[in-house]
Design a protein with these regions (language model features):
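Conserved catalytic core of the tyrosine transesterase superfamily
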Residues: 1-214
């Protein structure tokens, strides 16, 4: 059986991602055929607010050479544009990002169930990745991990989750959201933007079964 999401056609399949339309446009209505609990993902207005606040904090942090605001900005951007699980985020290293290929991607070495997969990146996010990698290399060159603490050590899952809670507070958003909501948000917008292509969502999120995606 021919797979809906074939690797040969990935460039065309991800045109919508390249245009960065996932979070720029508000959906025409709030109905999703894919059943998702609305308390578990951010709508486009909340995404816009969160990104704006964190981008401003990041720009200030870069000038003052502070790691935490810049790291938190990239944490949220990565979650929104890749849908990675929190354990996948904390284990991500600089060499796992492939930004010189025609279609940029990142490699998840050990995802859920110890499975590996490739996640494709929108062109606009590639620029953000390059910016963060270059800045981190200048600031903490000794660590390959993308998410590090002030001492340069690998950040834990718990620490990343706490950082996200602080991001919510900074943006004035409801505190009930967990960092996993970034994954739900990515999946929801990807589903809408891909004309309800569940197979594509399954591939990107790394679900072993399409029933999990549903």
């Amino acid at each position: 059986m021919r797979r809906d999401f074939d690797r040969q056609g990935k460039q065309k399949k991800f045109t919508f991602l390249m245009k960065d339309e996932l979070f720029r446009k508000k959906p025409k209505n709030n109905h999703f055929s894919w059943s998702v609990d609305e308390t578990k993902f951010l709508d486009s207005e909340k995404v816009k607010r969160l990104r704006k606040v964190l981008t401003s904090a990041k720009d200030k942090a870069i000038k003052e050479n502070k790691i935490v605001p810049a790291r938190n900005w990239f944490m949220v951007e990565l979650g929104l544009f890749t849908g990675l699980r929190v354990e996948e985020m904390v284990n991500l290293k600089a060499p796992d990002l492939h930004l010189k290929e025609e279609q940029s991607s990142l490699s998840v070495k050990k995802g859920k169930g110890d499975k590996s997969r490739t996640v494709y990146l929108p062109e606009t996010f590639k620029k953000e990745c390059l910016f963060y990698l270059n800045w981190k290399e200048r600031t903490f060159p000794r660590s390959d991990y993308l998410f590090i603490n002030r001492a340069g050590g690998q950040l834990t899952k718990r620490a990343l989750q706490k950082s996200f809670k602080r991001c919510l507070k900074l943006a004035g958003l409801e505190p009930h959201y967990s960092i996993h909501c970034l994954r739900h948000t990515y999946g929801s917008f990807l589903y809408k933007s891909s004309n309800h292509n569940l197979r594509m969502v399954q591939e990107q999120l790394g679900h072993s079964s399409i029933r999990t995606t549903q």
